Amino acid sequence: REEMVSKVAAITKFNIDQFAYMVKKMAGLPEGDGTLLDNCIMLWGSGLEDGNRHTRQNLPFIIAGRGGGTLNTGRFLSDVSGNQGDLLTTLLSCAGVPLDRPIGIATKEISELRVAGK
């Protein structure tokens, strides 16, 4: 069991290091009045809270970028009500992607993520 946990931890570290590398690179590329990162939305996360039990509550996600000013950033959110479909629907809406139907079991947008009035 410890060996498997160690392997998963190494894979997760590699993946988050790659995500951090991309965020840093995009933050250094000028675009318009800001940076490429200011105008993008990047998502990193896991589909499982606990891989052994395959639980899907309290999923860990990191969102980078400001979505052209549509995302309310720079915070840690916990106890946000919603599901993974709600998160994806919200991010796509912030990016200006029209959806003809909800993603998965989405029922709403997550208001804590969107800049008021955007």
Language model region names:
Residues 1-118:
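Ligand-binding pockets and gating/stacking loops
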